[in-house]
């Protein structure tokens, strides 16, 4: 295992705090019943990226014309972002489960 992965506690804490703020502000943490402290570990950047992608996909859904065309560029980008966000979020939850079960 790479040394930086072994010492993940040395990673910048403010990324995890930003993830906590976003999760609390959007209600995502409460909806999924995840305490905020879990967003601080083990990969805060991964969690922050997944929440950011999820919010971006919702923003792209409300396009300026007010219509949703299944063949439009923004719809395709939104679907791709949502799938990426879901995959990243599920991966981070799985990793957290492994970390807590080993304690």
Curated annotation (Swiss-Prot):
Keywords, sorted A to Z: Membrane, Transmembrane, Transmembrane helix
Entry membrane topology: Multi-pass membrane protein
Keyword field contains Membrane: yes
Subcellular location: Membrane
Domain of life where this protein originates: Eukaryota
GO cellular component terms attached to this protein's record: membrane
Transmembrane segments: 42-62, 65-85
Note: Partially overlaps YDL027C.
UniProt-recorded name of the protein: Putative uncharacterized protein YDL026W
Organism: Saccharomyces cerevisiae (strain ATCC 204508 / S288c) (Baker's yeast)
